[in-house]
C-alpha cells in the first residue's frame, strides 16, 4: 500500500461528483443566436423534419429523472437540437444522422404509475436500421439526450415556475415543463386542439421557437436566453413573459371560437402530485392524475 491509501500500481480516475453532474449546465455556454427559427405551420423545420412512424426504429434508451416528469406525463419529448447543440455537433447531426424533431417517446400505460425513472426510447429515421452508422448515431444521440435530461433539473430548482405560469389558465394553452442546457432555457407549451394551432401560430410570434404537431400533443418550444445566469429575478421575469405570451394565445382562441374558456380544474391538483414526486419521491398514479376533482 502507498501512503495515500491507494494500492500500488493503481491510479485514481478523476470523476465528477453526482452533484456537479446533476446541476444545470453552467459551462460550455453557446454563443448568441446566429439564425432564429420561428414556429410556423406553413413550412417544415429547416433541420429536423416531422416524425414519420413508417421509418422510425429505436436506436437507444435513456433513463429519465423525477425532474422530467412533465415530459413523461405527455409521453413525448420534443428537442429542437438547433437550439442547444454547437456548430460542430450540428454538422454531425446533418451529415451522419436522421433525427426528427421529437426523437424520444415513452409508454406509461403498461404500469399506470410514474416514479420518475422511466426509460425513454430514442429513435431515428435512417434508411439502414441496424447498420454500424445507425448504432453509432444512436450512441451519440443518447449522450446528447442525457444532457437534456440533466437540464430538466431546472424544474427541480424552480418548482414554482409551472404554478405561476399556469395560474387560472385554460386547458387549451398550458405550460408543460422546462429544460436548461448550455445557457438556453427551453420552455414547452401545449396547445390542446389542432384547430387552435392553426389560429394561434399564424396570428402571433413566439420569438425563437419551434412547433411540433405530433400524434399525442401539439408542442411549441420557446428558447429564452435572458435567464442564462439562473438568478431568481430573471427567472421570474421569464415566467411573466411566458405567461404574457400564453394569455395572448388565449385571447386569440377566444376570438376564434364561440365556446367559453374556463380555467383548468385539474391543473392545481396535478401540480400537487408533481411537487410530491419532486420533493418526497411519491409516485403518481395515472388514474389520480387524470381524474377530475369534484
Curated annotation (Swiss-Prot):
Keywords assigned by UniProt, alphabetized: Early protein, Host cytoplasm, Host nucleus, Host-virus interaction, Inhibition of host innate immune response by virus, Metal-binding, Modulation of host ubiquitin pathway by viral E3 ligase, Modulation of host ubiquitin pathway by virus, Ubl conjugation pathway, Viral immunoevasion, Zinc
Annotated disulfide bonds: none
Location within or outside the cell: Host nucleus; Host cytoplasm
GO cellular component: host cell cytoplasm; host cell nucleus
Single biological process term from Gene Ontology: symbiont-mediated suppression of host innate immune response
Motif (Nuclear localization signal) on chain: 239-255
Function: Plays a major role to prevent cellular inhibition of viral genome replication by nuclear bodies. Assembles an SCF-like E3 ubiquitin ligase complex based on the cellular proteins ELOB, ELOC, CUL5 and RBX1, in cooperation with viral E1B-55K. This viral RING-type ligase ubiquitinates cellular substrates prior to proteasomal degradation: p53/TP53, LIG4, MRE11-RAD50-NBS1 (MRN) complex, ITGA3, DAXX and BLM.
Quaternary structure and partners: Interacts with E1B-55k.
Family, as annotated: Belongs to the adenoviridae E4 30 to 34 kDa protein family.
Protein name: Early 4 ORF6 protein
Amino acid at each position: 500500500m502507498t501512503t495515500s491509501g491507494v494500492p500500488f500500481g493503481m491510479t485514481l480516475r478523476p470523476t465528477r461528483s453526482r452533484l456537479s453532474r446533476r446541476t444545470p449546465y453552467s459551462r460550455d455556454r453557446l454563443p448568441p443566436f446566429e439564425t432564429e427559427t420561428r414556429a410556423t405551420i406553413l413550412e417544415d423545420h429547416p433541420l429536423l423534419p416531422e416524425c414519420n412512424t413508417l421509418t422510425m426504429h429505436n436506436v437507444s434508451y435513456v433513463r429519465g429523472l423525477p425532474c422530467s416528469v412533465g415530459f413523461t406525463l405527455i409521453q413525448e419529448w420534443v428537442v429542437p437540437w438547433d437550439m442547444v447543440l454547437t456548430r460542430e455537433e450540428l454538422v454531425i447531426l446533418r451529415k451522419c444522422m436522421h433525427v426528427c424533431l421529437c426523437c424520444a417517446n415513452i409508454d406509461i400505460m403498461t404500469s399506470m404509475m410514474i416514479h420518475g425513472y422511466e426509460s425513454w426510447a430514442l429513435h431515428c429515421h435512417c434508411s439502414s436500421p441496424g447498420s454500424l452508422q445507425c448504432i453509432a448515431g444512436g450512441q451519440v444521440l443518447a449522450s446528447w439526450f442525457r444532457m437534456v435530461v440533466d437540464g430538466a433539473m431546472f424544474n427541480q430548482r424552480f418548482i414554482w415556475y409551472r404554478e405561476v405560469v399556469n395560474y387560472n389558465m385554460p386547458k387549451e394553452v398550458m405550460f408543460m415543463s422546462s429544460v436548461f442546457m448550455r445557457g438556453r432555457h427551453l420552455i414547452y407549451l401545449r396547445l390542446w386542439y389542432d384547430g387552435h394551432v392553426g389560429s394561434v401560430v399564424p396570428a402571433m410570434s413566439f420569438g425563437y421557437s419551434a412547433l411540433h404537431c405530433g400524434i399525442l400533443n401539439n408542442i411549441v418550444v420557446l428558447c429564452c436566453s435572458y435567464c442564462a445566469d439562473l438568478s431568481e429575478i430573471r427567472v421570474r421575469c421569464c415566467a411573466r413573459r411566458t405567461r404574457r405570451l400564453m394569455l395572448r394565445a388565449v385571447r386569440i382562441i377566444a376570438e376564434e371560437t364561440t365556446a367559453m374558456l374556463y380555467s383548468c380544474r385539474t391543473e392545481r391538483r396535478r401540480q400537487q402530485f408533481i411537487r410530491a414526486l419532486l420533493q418526497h419521491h411519491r409516485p403518481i398514479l395515472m388514474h389520480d392524475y387524470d381524474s377530475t376533482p369534484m
